[in-house]
Amino acid sequence: QHWSLCHAPG
């Protein structure tokens, strides 16, 4: 399961 590069909280 990969996340998007801009999936960081903020």
Curated annotation (Swiss-Prot):
Tissue-level expression reads: GNRH neurons lie within blood sinuses close to the gonoducts and gonads in both juveniles and adults, implying that the neuropeptide is released into the bloodstream.
UniProt-listed InterPro entries: GnRH
The answer to whether the entry has keyword Ligase is no
Subcellular compartments: Secreted
Its predominant location is secreted
Give all Glycine amide modified positions: 10
- From which domain of life does this come? Eukaryota
* Residue numbers of Pyrrolidone carboxylic acid PTMs: 1
Keyword set for this entry? Amidation, Disulfide bond, Hormone, Pyrrolidone carboxylic acid, Secreted
* Molecular function terms from GO: hormone activity
Q: Name one GO cellular component term.
A: extracellular region
What is stated as this protein's family in its record? Belongs to the GnRH family.
What does the function comment of this entry state? Stimulates the secretion of gonadotropins; it stimulates the secretion of both luteinizing and follicle-stimulating hormones.
How does this polypeptide assemble, per the annotation?
Homodimer; disulfide-linked.
The name of this protein is Gonadoliberin-2
